[in-house]
Amino acid sequence: MKFLVLALCIAAAVAAPLSADEASLVRGSWAQVKHSEVDILYYIFKANPDIMAKFPQFAGKDLETLKGTGQFATHAGRIVGFVSEIVALMGNSANMPAMETLIKDMAANHKARGIPKAQFNEFRASLVSYLQSKVSWNDSLGAAWTQGLDNVFNMMFSYL
């Protein structure tokens, strides 16, 4: 029975995969910001201090001071690198097993640390807000990001 529920969750997550055109929109917009790793993480932490507090190496520290450290840049690179891997795999159904492996591993890591779904949703909202402030945002791009993130987060939530 558990397998059936899991299979249904995964099927729902990929029920509307991105088309090649939608994936191209997502990749194009991501290419404009993906080298701003520190700025992206700073933006997310500034908007969500509760997320920053979940990282022992950053908890209780001044964000403005942290922003200029190598430790912050390294962690920002890991987070943005993960998003970059997922974005690169979108839009091609042959890439679904690779996406699922990445997402499953990330979900397991965060589940073990007790990260709630609400914080993932905060992260998502802040990431989208950052994108909207940095790229030429329109309805088509917004719809593509929404669908892509829905797919990723639905799959991730099935593993939390």
Swiss-Prot record:
Heme b binds at residues 75, 110. It comes from the Eukaryota. PROSITE patterns: GLOBIN (PS01033). Residues 17-160 form the Globin domain. Pfam families: Globin. Residues 1-15 form the signal peptide. There are at least 12 different components in Midge globin. This is Globin CTT-II beta. It comes from Chironomus thummi thummi (Midge).
